[in-house]
């Protein structure tokens, strides 16, 4: 069941829906902020980099690691098949890195990558996300963290787990 998520923005009132329902605060704000904060003519680089290499996100790195990455590691430790299935359901493209590694579409013009190494008898689970190096040309740097939080939400939902809402309730 690979599908690209499709959202609708009502021209009369600006409401955003997915299958007739609001997709949630973080998703809606990411979309609105992309309209508001994007550069005049943003272009994705296609070059996926670690969070700390994204322009102007440094002040948010500690919170990103503490909330997003640690939660992703906890949620999918011992559940690589569930994570793999979720990435495929979300339209991901397989990567050779990690026990599970996929490029996921955020918008039709912008991707992130999710990389995951499962726990074993010696090491805890490890995870990372990579972002287009020009993502802050599309949105405010604080929204990069929200994109990552949304990724965790949609991955847990697609995996058949309780959807993980890291920021917005």
Regions found by a protein language model. Give the residues of each.
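A short, glycine/Asx- and small/polar-enriched loop/turn
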Residues: 1, 106-110
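Single conserved hydrophobic/aromatic residue that forms the stacking wall/gate
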Residues: 1-11
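Long amphipathic alpha-helical segments with strong coiled-coil/leucine-zipper propensity
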Residues: 12-74
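Ampiphathic alpha-helical segments that act as solvent-exposed interaction surfaces
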Residues: 20-45, 132-167
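Negatively charged, low-complexity tracts enriched in Asp/Glu with abundant Ser/Thr
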Residues: 55-100
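Short beta-strand segments that buttress and anchor functional surface loops
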Residues: 101-105
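Short beta-strand micro-motifs enriched in acidic
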Residues: 115-121
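Low-complexity, glycine/alanine/valine/leucine- and proline-rich hydrophobic stretches
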Residues: 120, 128-134
């Amino acid at each position: 069941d690979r599908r690209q998520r499709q959202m609708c923005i009502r021209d009369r009132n600006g409401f955003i829906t997915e299958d007739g329902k609001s997709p949630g605060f973080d998703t809606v704000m990411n979309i609105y902020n992309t309209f508001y904060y994007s550069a005049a003519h943003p272009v994705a680089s296609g070059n996926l980099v670690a969070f700390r290499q994204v322009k102007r996100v440094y002040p948010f790195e500690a919170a990103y690691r503490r909330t997003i990455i640690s939660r992703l590691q906890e949620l999918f430790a011992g559940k690589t098949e569930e994570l793999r299935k979720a990435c495929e359901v979300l339209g991901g493209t397989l990567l050779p890195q990690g026990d599970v590694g996929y490029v996921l579409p955020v918008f039709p013009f912008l991707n992130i990558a999710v990389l995951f190494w499962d726990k074993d008898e010696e090491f805890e689970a490890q995870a990372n996300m990579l972002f287009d190096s020009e993502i802050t040309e599309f949105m405010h740097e604080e929204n990069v963290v929200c994109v990552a939080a949304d990724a965790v939400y949609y991955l847990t939902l697609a995996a058949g787990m309780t959807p993980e809402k890291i920021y917005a309730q």
